[in-house]
Regions:
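Basic, ligand-binding patches in group-transfer machinery
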Residues: 1-115
Length: 115
């Protein structure tokens, strides 16, 4: 997908809580769309992008009771967590900006990852 096919959203909030670098790069975190009440069912992806490369990375949903506890008024956020594993040989070395994709909406997380 071209970046133009995603809708820029200021309603997406979240964080990458853990980055584990080994044979794989494992990222764990969470994000929601604060303007939606359908967060448990959202498709979440990450985009790694720099001036040369862009990678769209699928994630696996993960239960996050801590996010639900922090937002008790939001019953739709318990499954807003994600985990993804990236084989190092599948991504070129470099510094990447990380974007959160929630369904077809995108937001720059402010996070950079060095591979």
């Amino acid at each position: 997908k071209s970046m133009k096919e995603y809708k820029l959203s200021g309603s997406i909030i979240g964080n990458i809580d853990d980055v584990i670098k080994g044979e794989h790069i494992t990222l764990k975190g969470w994000f929601i769309n604060s303007a939606s009440d359908q967060n448990n069912d959202a498709v979440r992806k990450l985009i790694f992008q720099n001036d040369i490369n862009r990678y769209v990375i699928s994630t696996t949903p993960e239960y996050r009771s801590d996010v639900g506890d922090a937002m008790p008024e939001r019953p739709d956020v318990d499954f807003c967590g994600f985990v993804c594993n990236i084989k190092k040989e599948h991504i070129n070395k470099g510094l990447y900006n990380v974007y959160f994709v929630w369904n077809n909406q995108i937001w720059f997380s402010g996070i950079q990852i060095r591979v």
